[in-house]
Amino acid sequence: MAVVTMRQLLDAGVHFGHQTRRWNPKMKRYIITERNGIYIIDLQQTLTYIDSAYEFVKETVAHGGNILFVGTKKQAQEAVATEAERVGMPYVNHRWLGGMLTNFQTVHKRLGRLKELQAMDAAENGYEGRTKKEVLMLTRERQKLERVLGGISDMNKVPSAIWIVDTNKEHIAVSEAQKLNIPVVAILDTNCDPDVVDYPIPGNDDAIRSAALLTGVIASAVEDGKKARAERAQAEAKAAAGDNDAPVSSEGESTEVASDAASTASETTATSSDESAAESSEAESK
């Protein structure tokens, strides 16, 4: 079964590119025609690239990796948050902080501060002994951190791969991923540079429905990857249990078997001797 159908892509407007005067010549190979001053993306290629990206994301997650979802433009914010939360992956949908990947240790400290403020806010007497002004300042700090870092609050290491809606807007994220050799999976509109993306999906990154559809596809790949990971872990556990249940020949058991064999041999010899003696006695009496 196809990951997504041609009809779904058409209905979401994935085939609409930018105006012909706003394009990147490197995207020429993904364009099928031009209509009313708008480039039309070849959806047949899009379907092929979707399959490749889907398989990559699925395998990455199946082997224990995580995917960071990034989309800070208004058209992508809701879809990025919704789909990432659906599959339990980190996301950034408001503002990309410089160094979020390349300086992750510092960002991780800020995450610690965020959790500290959240715990303080959740506690019954968390603000006890503080003035109203101090409480207000702490609340504002928490809200600011939640807005920027809330989506990655549970991310303890840099991601295995990154999903991006609009590589031009998220150029800092793309640059940081390249420096750390983190694979980039992204929507490529006709004004984007395909050279900076490892797993491109030619398509419209400006339409809400297009961004939502393609982000949903990547989220589904994550979901399938998690299922494959769970099945693999279950199979390994079952195999390990089978190995433990299998009979193991130990040195002690070998010795015991040898001892039993020796005892049996002795008994046989003794029985033979007794029979011989009886036969001799009978012969003498005759």
Swiss-Prot record:
A GO molecular function held by the record: structural constituent of ribosome
Pfam families, per database record: Ribosomal_S2 (PF00318)
Stretch list, region Disordered: 231-286
Keywords: Ribonucleoprotein, Ribosomal protein
CDD domains to which the protein is assigned, alphabetical: RPS2
Ranges of biased composition (kind: Low complexity): 255-280
A cellular component term, taken from the record's GO annotations: cytosolic small ribosomal subunit
SUPFAM superfamilies: Ribosomal protein S2
An individual GO BP term: translation
Record-annotated membrane-spanning stretches: none
Family indicated by similarity: Belongs to the universal ribosomal protein uS2 family.
Name the record gives this protein: Small ribosomal subunit protein uS2
Protein encoded by which gene: rpsB
